[in-house]
């Protein structure tokens, strides 16, 4: 899959690209429990990953993933909201232990079981609030087949470089729909490199330099004692309750992600000179947004387009862009506009408009109508 002058057309779904990119980027094991609409990922992983484990449930899957991560093997799983809700405590554990992993969350219509075969973008707020205390999880969101390849690589490498769980957000349509795609567009992916401790002195598992990222040592090595703990701890990994050193270490977990946020910031901004309106979207709805903007421009309207690919922590860059427009239209497939509220709070300014739906994909015409409205 290299760039050539000759097209290599294939009929492919996003799941296959995600699995292939995961392996090439350095993921070593897939651990999963079958759930719609993530079953293609489960199936392809069984064919492609060096190791694949079928867990009896989602809680077990995340616990096994933590075990593999502690050995220096990057684990990947995929689930939907019912499974993700069961994983939350273990994701918190992995975040506190600073164990890298990738959780692919394929959104479907809720609440609860909802409609497993209907798409949605209803898990935005859940992902944002996954970690108790407001600690951010790097979260990427796929908007097309290019992203299935490129953002998966970024997710794996961000997890390893920052020693953190990472969420790769998608939806039923994006990972189950077969589309015509030119494989020659795919860039080469090199495996991620783990930053291992190479000192001769005693190893302190949570000691860091100015990067705020501790060096890693796997449990399987025999030179140094290694501790992983989900309790509030000091640099040695020893439980310290609420001592200043332990609380400073917990605060570092948030600062670590924020310090390196620019390194995993990805978005598309198609700015049209003279436009006073911008359409913002993500995931599968981004395709409707792209078409809507193209059609509006063909009608002579000046409209810009912002596609968010890094959702969390919320990039300051998005506010910098949106603040330059007198009208902002945010399209997302959920009730009330979850990302819109996370961006602007409960009292959304009057010039910020939403286009929302549940149980169906948003149509370009709906976005066009809101752009043209005077409200």
Label each region the model flagged.
Residues 52-54, 103, 139, 305, ...:
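Conserved beta-strand scaffold positions in the cores of enzyme catalytic domains, especially
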Residues 118-172, 196-198, 370, 375:
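Conserved thiamine diphosphate
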Residues 28-31, 75-79, 138-142, 276-281, ...:
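Short glycine-rich or small-residue beta-strand-to-loop segments that form or flank ligand, phosphate
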């Amino acid at each position: 899959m290299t760039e050539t002058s000759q097209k290599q057309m294939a009929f492919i779904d996003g799941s296959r690209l995600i699995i292939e990119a995961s392996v090439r980027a350095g993921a070593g094991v897939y651990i999963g429990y079958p759930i719609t609409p993530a079953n293609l990922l489960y199936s392809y992983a069984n064919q492609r990953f060096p190791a694949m484990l079928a867990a009896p449930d989602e809680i077990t899957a995340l616990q096994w993933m933590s075990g593999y991560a502690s050995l220096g093997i990057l684990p990947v799983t995929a689930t939907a909201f019912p499974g993700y809700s069961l994983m939350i405590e273990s994701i918190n554990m992995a975040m506190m232990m600073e164990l890298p992993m990738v959780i692919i969350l394929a959104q479907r219509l809720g609440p609860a079981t909802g409609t497993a075969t209907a798409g949605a973008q209803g898990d935005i707020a859940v992902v944002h609030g996954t970690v108790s205390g407001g600690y951010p999880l790097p979260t990427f969101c796929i908007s097309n087949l290019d992203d299935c390849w490129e953002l998966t690589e970024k997710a794996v490498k961000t997890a390893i470089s920052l020693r953190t769980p990472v969420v790769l957000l998608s939806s039923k349509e994006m990972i189950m729909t077969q589309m015509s795609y030119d494989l020659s567009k795919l860039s080469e992916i090199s495996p991620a490199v783990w930053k291992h401790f190479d000192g001769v002195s005693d190893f302190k598992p949570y000691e860091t330099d100015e990067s705020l990222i501790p060096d890693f040592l796997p449990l399987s090595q025999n030179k140094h004692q290694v501790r992983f703990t989900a309790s509030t701890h000091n640099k040695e990994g020893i439980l310290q309750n609420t001592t200043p050193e332990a609380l400073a270490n917990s605060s570092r977990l948030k600062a670590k992600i924020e310090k390196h946020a620019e390194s995993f910031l990805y978005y598309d901004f198609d700015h049209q000179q003279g436009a006073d309106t911008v359409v913002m979207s993500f995931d599968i709805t981004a395709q409707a947004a792209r078409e809507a903007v193209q059609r509006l421009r063909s009608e002579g309207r000046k409209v810009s387009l912002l596609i968010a690919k890094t959702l969390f922590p919320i990039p300051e860059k998005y506010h910098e862009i949106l603040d330059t427009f007198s009208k902002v239209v945010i399209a997302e497939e959920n009730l009330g506009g979850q990302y819109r509220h996370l961006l602007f709070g409960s009292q959304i300014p009057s010039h910020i408009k939403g286009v929302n739906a549940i149980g169906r994909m948003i149509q370009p015409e709906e976005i066009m109508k809101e752009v043209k409205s005077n409200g």
